């Protein structure tokens, strides 16, 4: 590990987490609001939207190619006025341009030069089109530069005036139909203005833009006497950091006050706010108070007692009471008005303080650049020291620059860093004004922590500095200290050259070192490798480089590089050794990447460090030569030095660590409180210089926790001086790049970092977290309250404040502390089990139980250290061993004892897994472990008071809570919880119905399910929220009652073993806001975080205002006694209406109004028919209700009560108030369809929903699970209404409507139950009507009894569940909603006709194959009964077939198909002409056709399985011509077709379809002389065509043996004959293929591709001699040969005895073509 040199210059340390903190931390020179082109580096092309695509084209600066960063990380395209987004619901083509208020993912962020969004998608370029890809390596840059797209990110523009309390602009914002990406001007506003929400028309939130202005016009007031301009933002309430950024963005700063006159001017303003922020802060680690504009803090007007003595809970920002002019430190997160300030004249000439001058001084005095210094050895009070210096011809030291500070800390001191030395700074005034005793102007202040602390109303006050640190402190002038005198010396060289430096021109001296600039731009390391060791050296180099400020920005190489590309930067190796960093000065967002080399910038970021390419980047050089001995490195701790008792370390580390967690401290703390806590112990929050330190540190922490923790570390960017860069609180320089995608986000004003301890301790057995470590470090809001870790150098002495309770080693050694348990290990005395139990009890503890793997690991380790791995120890059995609920999924070695009935347990470090699973002898004498449940506290009392939590920034207050809307991609519960922690909050807890209503009112535009803070195991009782509050209110979805959920748990994912709660956002469903639960490892939206506030603030809800706006409606709250009719009249007088409540969001918002006012209000609901039906007074249809459960509806008018429910009340009684409203577009009077039914009033708190001529009630009552049969459901429907039936669905529109209703419950239920029954061998509805419309998922159900359930799923398909499997049936029912339906039209007569088996029509009889078949199977089944698949030839026949299909209810095959390979040439399978087209356009692929119940003719693949087919049998048959069969034709093989003679050839027509290749092979198989048919003349063409028509099957296409040669493009027959006859069809229709077919229907030929399509095959063979005679002759000869052989054998056997043969005679049969062989005669 490298050394950590603590120098006064180490204050500028930065760690870059690559946090894109847009707008709140970057330097003010980054405008970030300019438009730019997006260039792909590989192609040089720019992207722009074109139609529905984003394309790459040649770059230009036209509006069509310009983009801008706008709010919420969106990329806005200027011309299209849309944002680049990702539609995650699509697997492909998901990158599109969307409206900027779309719900799709619109955010984009940068990583190096790539652009990424959710789910690891990155912007890519393929084939000229921009796409989103997860493996993209595309590099994107801003046009005309080498900048990353995020190098100048979007900056917030804050506002004033208006009605947004100073909130920043939201870009783009919508006014009318135009999206504006910048502030706009119009006659209605006094200056350029913007909306602070997306939709100005909707929200009407706006403010005047605060942008840079030249001079003091507009929003500024000028004071020439003081020389400054001021901006008083009296109505704008922001946090200190937001106010600072608002001023910075205008080229100004927060108010600084430097004189009593300026203070009087500010306090004299009559219209100024009472409390305002000023720029005073102490946010820079280990430094004191300073102005944010870096002017000297010499004038003070602290409130008495502020700042107090150093406190742990001190606040680091200051505000001013403008009535008294007094200043007080407060929490930086408070929301307050603010004042900005900028100078009238900004041309300040800075003195030259860094140029070296040879100086002559008296003996004993230190010469330095024209002055002489003397550090006195004697001590004395300030006045005596002042007189002594005067006597020496000088004065007490005055310090005017960092060059002077450098003299103090590097030249005058070499001893104790805490030595205090008098300076010449003193105050004798009230209010305080510090002045130098030598009369020079105060141009610099360098205060120590919590300084300047000036006693109230006591003067004089004198200032000392602290030895080696050089920082200043206010002291009593009577205190005796050493002092430094200063006087002018004699400059001995006017030329300002120095003999120690080389004689070459350009060398400059600083201390004992010489420097020179080389102005040629070269790669890294060409000239030299510059090292920078302190802030003073950096300031000197800045002085050398400042002449380049006005030229084009230049860079200067340093010697800093990451040679190993591991993200660890060090100075270039000298002598083979890397030199560790002792100082860092990174620029904003740096170091940006590993593996680079570091250069210093010029311009506005003069001297800041940036990572550049070592090879390709060119920069100037500064070389450095030492003219004296190199300063020795400061001593660092040794790895073997000890740690304080109770502190921990790891090998080779130089620090000790201690965790302070809630179980051992009074409370969790903010970052500043935690850092001050550590400082009080002589420590700091942790810092890291190397990657392995992070890894080891995490390992150390994980051994102490069994649950996830976030812990503060020392990383922060709080100070304005850091300009958005990061530093360690202990001044350790930042040398490490931590690169992870999670870090590359802007976290607004999250200026402090925390580290997460992984909770999956057992998982680490297999997974080492090294590759995942970066996910455990995140920026947080600094006011978040977390546990923390302190770090102290090894060998240091721990400071012990009186409130601290340090670890003490007891008689049994130090304890082991895990979470909230404290374990003591008792080696002696050794006792039996019962004695060990008693011993622990006598010491206020218990025999230890082990319930987590973290505890097991720690206890095993301690046992092994104390007594070796074999020794057994007593522990106690536990009824709930380690995570017992998933032990069944673990191997043996991860199990704990199952012998829970046996109390005595012992374990050893080595064999614990076996020890805990076997019986032990309780009389054994063993050591044992005791456990204290109340772990020893590390604090005797709280030394500080907790800072008050307020609802700041975008936090929305409600009662004692603050809520924050968050946008994120879907995350697990723990990820959601962690993100809320980074904001300083938790996931929401819902403690009352009023909180539930408030949260519902925030749900519009959020996702359909969002995490809330409930987490439990399946074996736990849900009792607490994750914020620790008790579960006193619940709102689980009623469908969860009585339902058994099956939630998968995975061994490898511990989070999946927990259940977590979701809040459902079901849009306009009355169940919006109810809760569901699921596995915690699932991914859902994080939309809300909460934190508790100590101030109940209802400002955004304007509870005292009569008029409130919500969503698109304007409401007026009338707070006076009124009758219902009086309320109606009162609203009309206001040109408004008595409110109608049409959705759950309005209901929740108005419920909150009633709750906050504790008042019931009249609403516009009343009944005109004695409480039978209720309706809204403005005619809005009643489809949403929120009746109280116990409301009996005894009166005709309705109130919204204080509990948020609707209740009836007497219309003539006075109620405390009423709510009027003026509806916006969304809630204006609904236009009900003419055919929409008028439905009854809501039943059982659920409304009847109208659609077409029916009303529907979707039952969600808690007792609905008690019904399961359809008869029981029908009975339940009858109770709701006498005409109600269980749900039936008549058409597609109704099906879609029911699906839309079901989607409101889609996270709870999967089906709506359908009233389908089975009677008379068919399915029908419960009301005995036919299923005229169906949408079964798996096609025609194969049910033959009534033992099933049917349901409509969320995707619109119908599912059927047989009773065969009980678990599946129960699951189906428990995930179904019951629905009742009232049909206002009697469908029974219309829907009652069933489909007969045979249907005669004109010249045919039709029937339906009611079976799932392919097209070819349907064709075969029709053919087997002498039928054909149906064909259509006119509209009348089409309507007839459509009626059959509609009555059957399923899509059916017809006889239409295409086999040409292009799905274009369709033919009827019965051979009839395709003379009528039954569809308007071909909308689907496929080569066969079905007809569906909607009358749609669809193309489908012939091999796909459908629900049946239509066959027909003609009543009139055609007579077929006969063909002669000749014996001169080949014999028929197997089941082949008969050969037919025509002329001197034979022809065989195959029934099957074949490709051309198959056709050639087939003919060869039939006869070796056969070929695919060739045609010589017109007559043969007619014969073949007629043959195919008479033997028709599927198609008229016939392969011809005619093909085209590739070489000469000539055509030839396969049998080698010349082509003497052709009959090509019309050239315009003919193809360009190299094969040919005959179309038998019109007897023409067509060119086709040889490899595409199918056709029939006709084989042709020449007519030969009598084939049958030849066969007989061959057979006879064969027999004779056999006989001859037999005779020869017999002759040989019988010694050549001879027997004669009779003659053989051939005879002709009756048929001359036949050859007969009747018999053999002896």
UniProtKB/Swiss-Prot annotation:
Domain Fibronectin type-II: 164-211
Any one GO biological process: endocytosis
C-type lectin domain: residues covered: 225-341, 368-486, 493-625, 652-791, 958-1091, 1110-1222, 1251-1374, 1401-1513, 1542-1661
Molecular function via GO: carbohydrate binding
Glycosylation (residues): 135, 345, 377, 529, 843, 865, 934, 1076, 1225, 1320, 1392, 1593, 1626
Highest taxon of the lineage: Eukaryota
Matches recorded under Pfam families: CysR_MRC2_N (PF24562), fn2 (PF00040), Lectin_C (PF00059)
Keyword Transmembrane helix: yes
Transmembrane segments: 1667-1691
Keyword annotations: Disulfide bond, Endocytosis, Glycoprotein, Lectin, Membrane, Phosphoprotein, Receptor, Repeat, Signal, Transmembrane, Transmembrane helix
Main location: membrane
Sequence positions bearing Phosphoserine: 1703, 1719
Residues making up the signal peptide according to the UniProt record: 1-27
GO CC, alphabetical: membrane
Cellular localization per UniProt: Membrane
Membrane-side (Cytoplasmic) residue stretches: 1692-1722
Topology of this chain in the membrane: Single-pass type I membrane protein
Modification Phosphotyrosine occurs at: 933
Tissues and organs where the protein is expressed, per its UniProt entry: Expressed in the thymus and cultured bone marrow cells.
Annotated disulfide bonds: 169-194, 183-209, 247-340, 317-332, 389-485, 462-477, 597-614, 678-790, 752-782, 1060-1080, 1197-1211, 1488-1502, 1635-1650
Every Ricin B-type lectin domain range: 32-182
Function of the protein: Acts as an endocytic receptor to direct captured antigens from the extracellular space to a specialized antigen-processing compartment. Causes reduced proliferation of B lymphocytes.
Stated name of the protein: Lymphocyte antigen 75
Annotated gene: LY75
């Amino acid at each position: 590990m490298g050394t950590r040199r603590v120098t006064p210059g180490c204050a500028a340390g930065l760690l870059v987490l690559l946090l894109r903190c847009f707008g709140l931390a970057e330097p003010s020179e980054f405008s970030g609001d300019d438009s730019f082109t997006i260039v792909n580096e590989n192609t040089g092309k720019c992207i722009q939207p074109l139609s529905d695509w984003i394309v790459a084209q040649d770059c230009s600066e036209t509006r069509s190619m310009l983009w801008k960063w706008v709010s919420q990380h969106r990329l806005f395209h200027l011309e299209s006025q849309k944002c680049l987004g990702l539609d995650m619901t699509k697997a492909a083509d998901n990158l599109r341009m969307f409206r900027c208020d779309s719900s799709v993912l619109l955010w984009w962020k940068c990583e190096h030069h790539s652009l990424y969004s959710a789910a690891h998608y990155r912007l890519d370029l393929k084939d000229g089109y921009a796409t989103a890809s997860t493996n993209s390596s595309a590099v994107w840059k801003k046009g005309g530069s080498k900048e990353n797209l995020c190098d100048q990110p979007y900056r917030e523009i804050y506002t004033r005036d208006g009605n947004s309390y100073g909130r920043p602009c939201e870009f783009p914002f919508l006014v009318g139909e135009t999206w504006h990406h910048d502030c706009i001007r119009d006659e209605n506003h006094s200056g350029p203005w913007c909306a602070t929400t997306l939709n100005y028309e909707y929200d009407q939130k706006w403010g005047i833009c605060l942008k840079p202005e030249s001079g003091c016009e507009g929003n500024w007031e000028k004071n020439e006497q003081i020389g400054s301009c001021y901006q008083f933002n009296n109505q704008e309430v922001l946090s200190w950091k937001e106010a600072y950024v608002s001023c910075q963005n205008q080229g100004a700063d927060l108010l600084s006050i430097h004189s009593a006159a300026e203070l009087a001017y500010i306090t004299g303003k009559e219209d100024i706010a009472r409390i305002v922020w000023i720029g005073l802060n102490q946010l820079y680690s280990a430094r004191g108070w300073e102005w944010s504009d870096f002017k000297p803090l010499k004038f003070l007007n602290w409130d008495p007692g502020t700042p107090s003595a150093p406190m742990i809970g001190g606040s680091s920002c200051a505000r001013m009471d403008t009535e008294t002019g007094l200043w007080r430190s407060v929490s930086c997160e408070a929301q307050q008005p603010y004042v900005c300030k900028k100078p009238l004249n900004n041309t300040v000439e800075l003195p030259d303080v860094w140029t070296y001058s040879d100086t002559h001084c008296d003996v004993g005095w230190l010469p330095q650049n024209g002055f002489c210094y003397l550090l006195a050895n004697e001590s004395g009070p300030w006045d005596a020291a002042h007189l002594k210096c005067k006597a020496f011809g000088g004065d007490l030291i005055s310090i005017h620059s960092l060059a002077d500070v450098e003299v103090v800390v590097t030249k005058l001191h070499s001893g104790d860093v805490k030595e205090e030395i008098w300076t010449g700074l003193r105050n004798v005034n009230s209010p305080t004004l510090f002045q130098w005793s030598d009369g020079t102007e105060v141009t610099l202040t360098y205060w120590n922590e919590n300084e300047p602390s000036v006693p109230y109303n006591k003067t004089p006050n004198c200032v000392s500095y602290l030895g080696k640190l050089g920082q200043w402190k206010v002291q009593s002038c009577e205190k005796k200290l050493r002092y430094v005198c200063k006087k002018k010396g004699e400059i001995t060289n006017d030329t300002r050259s120095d003999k120690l430096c080389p004689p070459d021109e350009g060398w400059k001296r600083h201390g004992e070192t010489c420097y020179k600039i080389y102005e040629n731009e070269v790669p890294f390391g060409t000239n030299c490798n510059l090292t920078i060791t302190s802030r003073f050296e950096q300031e000197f180099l800045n002085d050398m480089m400042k002449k380049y400020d006005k030229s084009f920005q230049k860079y200067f190489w340093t010697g800093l590089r990451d040679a190993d590309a591991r993200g660890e930067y060090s100075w270039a190796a000298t002598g083979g050794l890397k030199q560790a960093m002792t100082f860092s000065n990174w620029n904003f967002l740096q170091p940006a990447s590993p593996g680079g080399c570091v250069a210093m910038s010029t311009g506005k970021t003069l001297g800041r460090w940036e990572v550049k390419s070592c090879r390709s980047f060119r920069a100037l050089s500064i070389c450095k030569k030492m003219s004296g001995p190199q300063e020795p490195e400061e001593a660092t701790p040794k790895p073997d030095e000890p740690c304080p008792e109770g502190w921990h370390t790891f090998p080779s580390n130089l620090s000790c660590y201690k965790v302070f967690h809630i179980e051992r401290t009074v409370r969790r703390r903010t970052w500043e409180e935690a850092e001050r806590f550590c400082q009080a112990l002589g420590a700091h929050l942790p810092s890291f210089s190397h990657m392995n330190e992070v890894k080891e540190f995490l390992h150390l922490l994980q051994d102490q926790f069994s649950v996830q923790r976030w812990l503060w570390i020392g990383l922060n960017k709080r100070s304005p001086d850091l300009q958005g860069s990061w530093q360690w609180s202990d001044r350790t320089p930042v040398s490490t790049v931590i690169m992870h995608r999670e870090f590359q986000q802007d976290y607004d004003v999250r200026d402090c970092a925390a580290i997460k301890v992984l909770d999956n301790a057992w998982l680490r057995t297999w997974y080492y977290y090294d590759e995942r470590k970066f996910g455990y470090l995140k920026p947080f809001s600094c006011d978040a309250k977390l546990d923390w870790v302190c770090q102290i150098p090894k060998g240091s002495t721990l400071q012990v404040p009186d409130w601290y309770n340090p670890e003490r080693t007891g008689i049994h050694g130090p304890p082991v502390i895990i979470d909230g348990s404290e374990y003591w290990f008792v080696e002696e005395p050794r006792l039996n089990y019962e004695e060990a139990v008693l011993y622990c009890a006598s010491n206020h503890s218990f025999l230890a139980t082990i319930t987590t793997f973290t505890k097991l690991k720690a206890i095993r380790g301690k046992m092994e250290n104390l007594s070796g791995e074999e020794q057994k120890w007593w522990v106690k059995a536990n009824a709930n061993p380690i995570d017992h609920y998933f032990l069944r999924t673990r191997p043996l070695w991860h199990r704990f004892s199952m012998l829970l009935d046996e109390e005595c347990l012992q374990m050893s470090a080595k064999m614990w897994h076996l020890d805990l699973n076997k019986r032990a002898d309780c009389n054994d004498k063993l050591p044992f472990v005791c456990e204290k449940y109340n772990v020893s506290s590390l604090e005797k009392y709280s030394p500080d008071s907790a800072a008050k939590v307020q609802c700041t920034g975008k936090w929305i207050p409600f009662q004692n809570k603050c809520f924050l809307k968050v946008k994120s991609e879907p995350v697990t519960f723990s990820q959601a919880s962690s993100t809320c922690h980074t904001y300083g909050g938790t996931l929401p807890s819902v403690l009352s119905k009023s909180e539930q209503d408030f949260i519902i009112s925030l749900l519009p535009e959020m996702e359909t399910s969002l995490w809330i803070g409930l987490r439990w195991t399946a074996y736990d009782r849900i009792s607490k929220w994750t914020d620790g509050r008790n579960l006193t209110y619940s709102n689980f979805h009623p469908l969860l009652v009585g339902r058994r959920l099956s939630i998968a748990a995975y061994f490898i994912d511990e989070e999946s073993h927990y259940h977590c709660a979701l809040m459902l956002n079901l849009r306009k469903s009355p169940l919006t806001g109810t809760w569901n639960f699921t596995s915690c490892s699932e991914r859902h939206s994080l939309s809300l975080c909460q934190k508790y506030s100590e101030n109940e603030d209802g400002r955004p809800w304007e509870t005292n205002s009569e008029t409130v706006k919500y969503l698109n409606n304007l409401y007026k709250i009338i707070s006076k006694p009124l009758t219902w009719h009086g309320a109606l009249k009162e609203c009309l007088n206001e040109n408004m209406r008595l409110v109608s409540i049409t959705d759950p969001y309005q209901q929740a918002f108005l419920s909150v109004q009633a709750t906050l006012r504790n008042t019931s209000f009249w609403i516009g609901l009343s009944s005109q028919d004695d409480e039978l039906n209720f309706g809204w007074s403005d005619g809005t249809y009643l489809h949403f209700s929120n009746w109280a459960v116990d409301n009996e509806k005894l009166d005709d008018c309705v109130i919204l009560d204080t509990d948020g429910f609707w209740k009836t009340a007497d219309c003539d009684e006075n109620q405390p108030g009423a709510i009027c409203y003026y509806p916006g577009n969304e809630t204006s009077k609904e236009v009900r369809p003419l055919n929409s039914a008028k439905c009854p009033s809501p039943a059982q708190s659920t409304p009847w929903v109208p659609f077409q001529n029916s009303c529907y009630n979707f039952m969600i009552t808690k007792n609905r699970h008690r019904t399961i049969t359809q008869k029981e459901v029908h009975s339940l429907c009858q109770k709701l209404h006498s005409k109600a039936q269980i749900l039936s669905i008549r058409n597609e529109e109704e099906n879609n409507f029911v699906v839309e209703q079901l989607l409101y419950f889609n996270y709870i239920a999967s089906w709506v139950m359908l009233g389908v029954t089975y009677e008379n061998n068919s399915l029908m509805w419960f009301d005995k009507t036919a299923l005229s419309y169906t949408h079964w998922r798996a096609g025609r159900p194969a049910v033959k009894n009534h033992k099933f359930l049917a349901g409509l799923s969320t995707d619109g398909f119908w599912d059927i569940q047989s009773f065969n499997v009980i678990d599946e049936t129960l699951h189906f029912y428990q995930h179904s909603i019951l629905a009742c339906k009232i049909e206002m039209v009697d469908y029974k007569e219309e829907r009652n006709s069933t489909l007969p088996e045979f249907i005669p029509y004109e010249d045919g009889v039709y029937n339906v194959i009611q079976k799932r078949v392919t097209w070819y199977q349907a064709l075969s089944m029709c053919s087997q009964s002498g039928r054909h698949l149906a064909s259509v030839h006119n509209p009348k026949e089409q309507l007839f077939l459509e009626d059959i299909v509609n009555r059957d209810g399923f899509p059916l095959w017809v006889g239409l198909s295409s086999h040409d390979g292009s799905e274009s040439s369709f033919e009827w399978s019965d051979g009839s002409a395709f003379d009528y087209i039954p569809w308007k356009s071909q909308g689907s692929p496929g080569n066969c056709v079905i007809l569906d119940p909607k009358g749609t003719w669809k193309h489908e693949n012939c091999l796909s399985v459908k629900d049946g087919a239509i066959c027909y049998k003609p009543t009139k048959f055609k007579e077929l011509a006969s063909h002669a069969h000749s014996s001169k034709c080949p014999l028929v093989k197997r089941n082949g077709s008969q050969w037919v003679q025509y002329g001197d050839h034979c022809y065989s027509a195959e029934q099957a379809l074949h490709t051309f290749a198959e056709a050639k092979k087939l003919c060869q198989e039939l006869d070796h002389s056969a070929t695919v048919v060739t045609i010589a003349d017109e007559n043969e063409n007619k014969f073949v065509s007629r043959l195919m028509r008479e033997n028709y099957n599927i198609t008229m296409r016939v392969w011809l043996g005619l093909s085209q040669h590739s070489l000469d493009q000539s055509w030839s027959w396969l049998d080698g004959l010349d082509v003497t006859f052709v009959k090509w069809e019309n050239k315009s229709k003919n193809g360009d293929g190299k094969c040919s077919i005959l179309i038998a229907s019109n007897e023409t030929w067509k060119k086709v591709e040889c490899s595409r399509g199918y056709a029939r095959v006709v084989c042709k063979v020449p007519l030969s001699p009598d084939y049958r005679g030849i066969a007989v002759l061959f057979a006879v000869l064969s027999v004779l040969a056999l006989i001859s052989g037999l005779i020869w054998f017999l002759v040989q056997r019988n010694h050549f005895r001879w027997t004669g043969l009779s003659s053989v005679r051939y005879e002709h049969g009756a048929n001359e073509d036949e050859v007969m062989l009747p018999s053999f005669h002896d």
